[in-house]
Amino acid sequence: MGKFTSFLKRAGSATKNALTSDAAKRMYKMAGKTLQKVVESEVGSSAIDGVMQGTIQSIIQGENLGDSIRQAVILNVAGTLESAPDPLSPGEQLLYNKVSEIERAEKEDRVIETHNKKIIEKYGEDLLEIRKIMKGEAEAEQLEGKEMEYVEKALKGMLKIGKDQSERITRLYRALQTEEDLRTSDETRMISEYREKFDALKQAIELEQQATHEEAMQEMLDLSAEVIETAAEEVPIFGAGQANVVATTRAIQGGLKLKEIIDKLTGIDLSHLKVADIHPHIIEKAMLKDRIPDNELAMAIKSKVEVIDEMNTETEHVIESIIPLVKKEYEKHDNKYHVNIPSALKIHSEHTPKVHIYTTPWDSDKVFICRCIAPHHQQRSFMIGFDLEVEFVFYEDTSVEGHIMHGGAVSIEGRGFRQAYSEFMNSLVYPSTPELHKRRLQRSLGSHPIYMGSMVITVSYEQLVSNAMKLVYDTDLQMHCLRGPLKFQRRTLMNALLFGVKVA
C-alpha cells in the first residue's frame, strides 16, 4: 500500500516566451504553411483522435526545427477502438457507450453469421444455442428449468475462448523469443504473418503522425480501420484473409451473448472482462521508426497475454467461488429462475472492477477523482485525484468493500475510498490556494463526492497502476496533458490513465 502526492507541471512562461520570440517568428515564416496548420489545430483539437491525441507541441528555442517538434501520442486507436470521453460529462459518456454498443453489435453479428460453422467446430454447438436464446430465435420453454445449466455452459465457453486466445498469442510470444535458426516452419510462418500485420499498423501510424490537416486525417482513419481489424488478432482464429469479416476473439465472445445470459439469469455483471484489441505496448513499438527486434516485439505481445490471463483468472474465480452461491439461490426457488435471484447477487455499480469517476460538489470543473478497482479476485483498488486549479495530483492505494463477488472474506489493507478522498481534499487547502477555490473545497469536504460514471479497463491492473504513477511523477508527460481547454485536459488525463501516453 502506498500514498503519493505531487504538483503537476505545465508548460510555463519560458515556453510561452520561446513560442512568441522574434527567432520563433522567423522560423515560423521559414517553415511555411505546413507548420502553421499544425500549430493552429493543436490547442484543444483532437484532429488525430485515432492515434494521436492532438497535442503536437512546438517549442522553438533556436535549435533544429525537426528536433523541437514533440508529439504526445495516446497509446490506443480511438477512431476504431476505444477512447475515453470527458470524465465529467455523463451525457458524453452515455452517447459514446451507445454508439460503441451499436457498432460492436453490428460487427459481432457479421462475424457470427460469416463463421457460423467454424465456431461450432471449434467451440461447440451449445454456445450458438445461447445466442439463439438471447436473440429470441429459440423457444423460451427451452430455457425453463435449465437456467443453471446454461449459465455454466456460458462461463465454461468464455473460459475456453479466453484460454484459446492466450495459448495462440503465447505461441507467438515464444516463437519470437526463439533463435531464428531454431524455429520450426510453423513458427517462422506465424511470425512472418504477424510481421505483415505489425508493419501495416506501423505504416498507418506513421501516416497518421505525418498528417497535418483534418481532411488527410479522415482518410488515414478509414485506412486504419481495415489495418486494425487484422492487427487486433495476433494469431488468427480463422478468416483473417478478409478484412471485413475478421473473427476476433472479442467479436466471437460478444456475438455469442455469453455475458448477457449470465447477467440476465444471475445478476452477475462481467462487462469488465474486456481486453484491448491492440495492446498499448504494441502501439508504442509501432510508433518507433526503426525495425523492432523480435525480442522487443515479444515483450509487447506478452503484455496482452498478461491481460488475457488476468481475465481468465477472473472467470475461473466466478466459476469456483461464485457459482456455488448462485446454485444456493436457485435451490431456494426449486432450481428455476425467479426475479429475486439477480437482485440477491447484484453488487453496487460503484464496486464493479472499472475506473469510477467522481467530482466535488463545488468547483467541479477543476477537480476530478478516479477510483480504479481491480478484478474481483485481486481485491485491490487505488484512488487518483486531480485539481487542475492548483495543479495537484494525489494517489493512494485503497481497500475494497466486501461483497458477494469476492466469494468469501476480504483482506482489508489500507484506508477506504472515503478516507482517501478526505485527505485529498485537505491536501488542496494550503496558503497559496486561491481564496475562492479554497472556500469551495472546504464546502465540498463535508459532502460526499458526486458520482459521474465509469469506464472499462482494457489493460492489466498492474499496467493501470503504472500509468497512474507516471501521471504523478513524469513532469514531461504532465506538461503534454495539461494543455488546451479544461475539457480537453480532463479527457487527455483520462486517456493517459487508461491507455498510457508516449511522449515522442
UniProtKB/Swiss-Prot annotation:
UniProt keyword list: Capsid protein, Outer capsid protein, Viral penetration into host cytoplasm, Viral penetration via permeabilization of host membrane, Virion, Virus entry into host cell
UniProt GO molecular function: structural molecule activity
Subcellular location: Virion
Region (Involved in membrane permeabilization) residue spans: 1-42
Gene Ontology CC: one annotated term: viral outer capsid
One annotated GO biological process: symbiont entry into host cell via permeabilization of host membrane
Pfam families: Orbi_VP5
Entry keyword Secreted: no
Ligase in keyword set: no
Functional note: VP5 protein is one of the two proteins (with VP2) which constitute the virus particle outer capsid. Acts as a membrane permeabilization protein that mediates release of viral particles from endosomal compartments into the cytoplasm. Permeabilization activity is probably negatively regulated by VP2 and is triggered by endosomal degradation of VP2 and exposure to low pH.
Similarity annotation: Belongs to the orbivirus VP5 family.
Name recorded for this polypeptide: Outer capsid protein VP5
Organism: African horse sickness virus 6
